[in-house]
């Protein structure tokens, strides 16, 4: 008897659902795309408990005919293509006929729909893929579909869902992308009775950007437009001054379909050339109009990825369009006087909101402890070791190349460093390569030193260096009794700063400096959700945020170790970094924050120091617990002992040299 048999439709749909319906956000995406294909002008998304209880999508589109409503839930039933030729020129969001049967196979679905001119509509109810009820029902034009009891018959799938907050974040993100891709459609998104997002649907993309990323971001967007024989590129990109810590703020659409394409994302970044800081990315919304023949959308189960013809041509067009637009823009940031001189209504509104946010509100005292102004090249003195703070901060980080002993400087671990960083996507802080010596590599080790290592290190302390001069505004030349030292000034101050900040950030101190005017921070809905999840983590490093509206937070004070004049930037950098790397413990965040602060506050390459500043740097370096490496593991110094120097100048030669014995020492 044969073993092969055909699967029944319900089981086949459940298998297909494993690829198409991964989580509640997948349901939202598929249902909203169906609404867009139905020429809807308005789409309302209503979600309960992050989609775990219910997802409801209401539109004013074409609706479904009564005779088609049952067929719509059959696998591979679609109105969008009729032949294989249509598959190569698809212009609709959906076309496979998989979404509705896949959703119905793993949930409880109720759909009510009506077409224009009909006196009544039709309602259908399915559960687990089985049709339960089909009957006439009162309905306005469009479709109203509600999905409940998701994965009731596949409980194992529930185990792979993230927390409700994470699932809500993913739903919000996909709605934002769909709204950016379709500015002519009015979207609204409500969760647990609270409206989280609304767009006007007036085809003004810049307004949609402002609704998602904030009004200030919307004002700093540049409109772009470019075309060639095959492609037309349009949209908005942010000024170089407006950046984020990840690429997640870049949205690319093809014929108003949101896609993910790493090469096109790189093209957007390339268009900025050197105008972006390392590790920072723009906000961008780019739509590409092209002949459907040039794109294959049938290469991914969820259609998030596509295959493009003439991709290199498109990459060049995107990069050049952005490059030309930025080239004609005045990139000197303007001071917005309005933000410093608010009108009376704004002052009254701010005062009212402050009082509502906190029952007890007092203006910041004028006698608040001021932060000390320090020059860019002034180095904080490391404080006494505190094992409790060190333990609280140490965490697992990629194993750096660490030099524990003085003699290791004679055989530095530069070769290992080169091997690690030569393929990294991000460049090192300097364009010039660091000199290398390759006698023998030093094995990577953990940043923490055990007791034995610390005892050994005390016996091999960093030498007291006598300053000689500076090379290329980047390296300090110094000498000691055992030879020449070349010190990377950025890495040296980064190490000094790191040990200072690690101590300060590790302290949970009551010493806070009040802002004279509380700082109001605005974020997108997705970012605000992430911040709400990590308020305790931020409080642990001295940033106590309070909710101040839907996507806004208020910060009344900051740690006293913030540098004067940079308080707002420092707070925003720390919050932005947490948004990008949300999956961190408090200990890890403290460690990473200390590293970030030490790097940003260190002197850079091509910065010329006077003799006093250089000597101060060399004097404080030996006071560090580990003066041999920066926090990222890069060597601080390279050492040439006397023997190395003499060999370089042939003042001594190897014993195997045939003529070495023919010369007396005094001849050299």
UniProtKB/Swiss-Prot annotation:
Q: Which SUPFAM superfamilies match?
A: ATPase domain of HSP90 chaperone/DNA topoisomerase II/histidine kinase, DNA mismatch repair protein MutL, Ribosomal protein S5 domain 2-like
Q: Which GO terms describe its biological process?
A: mismatch repair
From what superkingdom does this record's organism come?
A: Bacteria
Q: Which GO terms describe its cellular component?
A: mismatch repair complex
Single GO MF descriptor: ATP binding
Which InterPro entries does the record cross-reference, listed alphabetically?
Answer: DNA_mismatch_repair_CS (IPR014762), DNA_mismatch_repair_MutL (IPR020667), DNA_mismatch_S5_2-like (IPR013507), HATPase_C_sf (IPR036890), MutL/Mlh/PMS (IPR002099), MutL/Mlh/Pms-like (IPR038973), MutL_C (IPR014790), MutL_C_dimsub (IPR042120)
Asked whether the UniProt record includes DNA repair among its keywords, one would answer yes
Keywords annotated in UniProt: DNA damage, DNA repair
Q: Does the keyword Signal apply?
A: no
PROSITE patterns named in the record: DNA_MISMATCH_REPAIR_1
Q: Name one Pfam family in it.
A: DNA_mis_repair
Q: Family per UniProt?
A: Belongs to the DNA mismatch repair MutL/HexB family.
NCBIfam families hit by this protein:
mutl, PRK00095.1-3
Describe its function.
This protein is involved in the repair of mismatches in DNA. It is required for dam-dependent methyl-directed DNA mismatch repair. May act as a 'molecular matchmaker', a protein that promotes the formation of a stable complex between two or more DNA-binding proteins in an ATP-dependent manner without itself being part of a final effector complex.
Identification of the protein by name: DNA mismatch repair protein MutL
| Species of provenance | Limosilactobacillus reuteri (strain DSM 20016)
